[in-house]
Amino acid sequence: MSRIGKAEIKLPDKVEVKQENANIKVKGPLGELFTPIFEGISVKTENGIVKLERSNEDQKVVALHGLTRALLMNCVKGVSQGWEKNLEITGVGYRAQKRGEDLVMSLGFSHEVVYKAPKGIKIDVQEQLKIKVSGIDKQLVGQVAADIRSKRPPEPYKGKGIKYAEEFIKKKAGKTGKK
């Protein structure tokens, strides 16, 4: 049996889980999310505890058992606490600022880079060098952070660019001159 799939999910206060056709609807204080229920997986809710059970031991169903539980847990945490990713900008003259709902970045190009946040994502800028991406959907928060990072990924010689706050950049040695 899947170790992840058989683990129970304890629902926090004010979080509801309902099954609607082939989806699970998770509603909480921060909003609501939907996650798919794969064929062969059933969801049971009792006394604030959600259990996932599978109908048979096919390899595909066994694989999807843990996945469904992980996706459901991400939804529960998202609607109760939310998700966030922090980015840092390193480099002389590199900076970010908010202009309305857009993120405007100066990253050493001849033009400013403008990033429009998708619906459900909040972007905050602190000290012009730190960007915080937050929202209730873990996948969308991670994708937005990756999109922002891809505008100027850190380079390996000086580390200039946009990196995740917890990311370590392995630096290369520069050229050695001819003697």
Swiss-Prot record:
InterPro entries: Ribosomal_uL6-like (IPR000702), Ribosomal_uL6-like_a/b-dom_sf (IPR036789), Ribosomal_uL6_a/b-dom (IPR020040), Ribosomal_uL6_bac-type (IPR019906), Ribosomal_uL6_CS (IPR002358). Gene3D superfamilies: Ribosomal protein L6, alpha-beta domain. GO terms for biological process: cytoplasmic translation. Keywords: Ribonucleoprotein, Ribosomal protein, RNA-binding, rRNA-binding. One of its GO terms (cellular component) is cytosolic large ribosomal subunit. It comes from the Bacteria. Belongs to the universal ribosomal protein uL6 family. This is Large ribosomal subunit protein uL6. It comes from Leptospira interrogans serogroup Icterohaemorrhagiae serovar Lai (strain 56601).
